[in-house]
Amino acid sequence: MYGSETWALKVGDVQRMMSTERMMVRWMCGVSLKDRRSSLELLDCMGIVCICERMRRCRLSWFGHVERKSCDDWVSKCRDLVVEGARGVGRGRKKWFECVANDMRDLGLRRGDAMDRAVWTGGILGNRPTRACAETRTLKRR
């Protein structure tokens, strides 16, 4: 998913993407809803990682890359940029770092873990037990 590293997705966006993914997987497998096969079963059968998990991995991978950059790099400067001026009325837009912070919390990662590439990659890929893995197992049982 090119560019998904920088998307700040809302819950509705994720649900639409998952719905579309499930529809495409059913079409590829030649399975209809009448066949009463779960989408998770089809994903496991085909060896496909759920699209929301793939986007999470891409987002956290990009965050680790940005964190390891030097402070003088333009990417770090853009990340730490503070925009001055009055903000509009109403709720602000969801920020990319909010998504990353939620992902790190779900996987039990800390911001400092990004400096050690092996720890960071292991946490993203699920090579160590995390809270998100337990939630995934619970979803598969249903």
What is the predicted role of each segment?
Residues 1-142:
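Short linear motifs embedded in intrinsically disordered, charge-biased segments
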